[in-house]
Amino acid sequence: MKKIKNFIVKEAVDLGSFFYKNTKYKTNENPVKVNLGCGLQCLPGWINIDGSLTALFGSKKFSFINKLLYKLAGSSEYYSFETYNKVIQKDGLKFYNLIKGVPVKSDSADVIYCSHFLEHLNRNDGRFFLEECFRALKKGGLLRIAVPDLDFAFAMYERGEVEAMLGLFFYTSDDYSFTAHKHNYNFTYLKSILENLGFISVVKLSYQHGECPGIDYLDVYPDHSMYVECKK
């Protein structure tokens, strides 16, 4: 049954990727703020984009579809159905497979926020994703990234907290391959990648602190995360 569910989810997302491949989202809001890999952390006035089954098939009209998605997409492990359905009803969630790029026009975004998505990409896909963020941002635009902090993992290991460290930072799953952590970063490593891509003013910040708007709501991982901001 689990293999069948995995197959359905993968094929559906792949099909969605094909039909949405040329999509470019836009907004009349100013400044233009983009929330990538957002899950259900959607904010009004932002372009909220996710590559999930929920973003692809969530329905404003038919709640029975959302109930099916709620279980199939695994959201029942993290959210109540009321919370899940409320996000869909607001129509604030857009679909795009972010492995394929960032679906906004070049030099169009003032702010890009991305929390706990980058670690789910392998090394090459992660670099391409960051290249796409650079392309999408206006000159002077701000990128804020949250990822598990690999230095925190090293500290856990040195304290003998090996099992907890493996679960947090080297997470794998039998349910859906995308939920696995495929690449990890500390600040020195991520800073070097960002600077090589052309980003400037790369700084490490703390939970809910920084220039990025909306982080009092968007930042949801206070304990083991690294928050980095940089500019184009």
Kindly give the residue locations of the regions a language model identified.
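Class I SAM-dependent methyltransferase SAM/SAH-binding core
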Residues: 30-101
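Class I SAM-dependent methyltransferase Rossmann-like catalytic core
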Residues: 1-31
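A short SAM/SAH-binding and catalytic strip from SAM-dependent methyltransferases
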Residues: 110-124
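Active-site flanking residues adjacent to catalytic metal/cofactor-binding acidic residues
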Residues: 34, 49, 115, 145-148
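A short acidic, Gly/Pro-enriched loop at the edge of an enzyme's catalytic core
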Residues: 96-112
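Structural motif
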Residues: 25, 85, 103-104, 194
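S-adenosyl-L-methionine-dependent methyltransferase catalytic module, highlighting the catalytic core
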Residues: 73, 96, 101, 122-231
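Structured loop/turn residues at beta-strand edges in well-structured enzyme cores
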Residues: 88, 107, 197-200
